[in-house]
Amino acid sequence: MMPMPRPHLKAFALLLACLAGQALAAPQHALTLYDEAPKYPANFKHFDYVNADAPKGGTFRQAGFGGFDSLNPFINKGVSADDIGLIYDTLMTQSLDEPFTEYGLVAGKIEKAPDNSWVRFYLRPEARFHDGQPMQAEDVVFTFNTLIKDGAPLYRGYYADVAEVIAETPRQVLFKFKHNNNRELPLILGQLPVLPKHWWENREFTKGNLEIPLGSGPYKVAEVKPGRSIRYERVKDYWGKDLAVNRGFYNFDEMTTDYYRDSTVTLEALKAGQFDYRLETAAKSWATAYDVPAVRQKRLILEELPNGNPTGMQGFVYNIRRPLFQDVRVREALSLLLDFEWTNKQLFNGAYTRTRSYFENSDMAARGLPDAAELKILEPLRGKIPDQVFSQAFANPVTDGSGMIREQQRRAYKLLQEAGWRIVDDKMVDAQGKAVSIEFLLAQTEFERVLLPFKRNLADLGIDLVIRRVDVSQYINRLRSRDFDMIVGGYPQSNSPGNEQREFWQSAAADNPGSRNFIGLKDPAIDTLVEQLINADSRQSLIEHSRALDRVLQWGYYVIPNWHIKTWRVAYWNHIGHPKVSPKYDIGINTWWIKPDVEPAVPLAPAAQPAEGAK
């Protein structure tokens, strides 16, 4: 044999290295973020937080808010029906008692490159759509390409680091990555729903309508009353019903959702037995509105379930696309005028804690001054991020709860003067001499009473706050077109923040209708911090990068932080059962069941009719 020239030897060595890397990649039943061992072994029988022998049957009745006009949740058009995701299966499914571990669903086995440059999914041969057609690799490729091309903008952000998707065999699909730094990407791809190519290829995917789509999941759509109600039926011959990841799940024969336009009416409908379950989000209602015979007789159960998730950030969000809010001094000044202590005492019965961090209730929340590891991340950005990041620990203003906030108003007025604002004829005018009027856009009535004290505090400084409530459809359309001054916005966080942060904070998402960059952030420094967070190579590194990002967001005053609790408040009728062990990171409503030996609540006359249709 002739000796191989040296350049060819180098290429041959690289080939051997690649082959060695592929040989080291063994198919596995689960994926974890940092390759730690999953909680459940390959032969596990069911998750710990289910009743594996839960009875099947009955109808589970829920209430929705507003209405719906679409059965396509994947596009940025219309309002999709609640729970429509139950008709679809995903490649993998996330356990609800681990921070971020996924187990095979449509994909029975998963293979990941040791250097994180690709991931391969092996589809189960028994996986079927509801029409009996097998789920194949070409369906996965079709789904991915369709979501990238025609889906909501968030998918392009989620999958931005995917270079190529290949159907290698009818049941084997490979995703190649642009780089190997995004450790979350294999798990993000595991969340990919599998849409039927043969059903969608002759339909217009971007057309949001009420045609019942073909799915593969544990439920199918049985009946639609546009804007008013939707009914799902459990698929009796569901292909995945005996999988370990599904045992103890999907116990209701039917699930129905009736839509209401008013939260107060919805609560009265629950107490009248019109539906079975409610997640209560209003502290005052939880404290005072359930003093009824059904609760005292323990037929209507009130329960607080532990919530182990980061609570994230809910707040009054500024749209900094508006010139009014582009000066950070203005944003800080207005934040001084929310009297949380009075609001919590008078309106919330003291139920809440003030939110400070964008990663609240987690080890990713910034605390005190940045440590050495955080400074290593932040120092290269000095001069491009607020100076306070390096020298001060962020804190919300604190009042005495009396409702008198003269000191905060004086500080706010001083900041507004520095920004060029001034009082003219008892009205605040901005630096251009225009009277300041702020529209606060709402879709739900319960926040109006919360905003009224804030409105009064602004009025004391000559600022007019207009509270504008619109229906859900109009609200969503205005959010998508960024036609608002301020809103109540939420930035939920998981225990493993990653690709979704691009949708929240990055410049590329600011002009994408449908992204969650409600603020309109276009800051290269924040873009950099987000990418570094996504590419963190260990849990400790993720914590450090999350804290660094948190500090920059806090000192930008992009929202006026609201409040949080660390439990889920649920009310449900006593014919509903749930497992003794609750999952740490979810309510786990799909593990609940109907008790066959307890009669459901007999509905009384409804307080009002449900919504008549989405507008």
Model regions and ranges:
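N-terminal lobe/hinge region of extracytoplasmic solute-binding protein
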Residues: 26-115, 122, 145, 214
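Detector for C-terminal structural segments
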Residues: 28-31, 64-66, 79-82, 86, ...
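Aromatic- and charge-enriched surface segment that lines or borders ligand/interaction sites
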Residues: 50, 54-55, 77-83, 109-153, ...
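Gly/Pro-rich hinge or "lid" segments in bacterial periplasmic/extracellular proteins
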Residues: 87-98, 145, 189-254, 261-265, ...
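Ligand-site clamp/hinge motif
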Residues: 124, 207-210, 240-290, 336, ...
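Surface-exposed binding/hinge segments that line
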Residues: 156-201, 218-225, 369-382
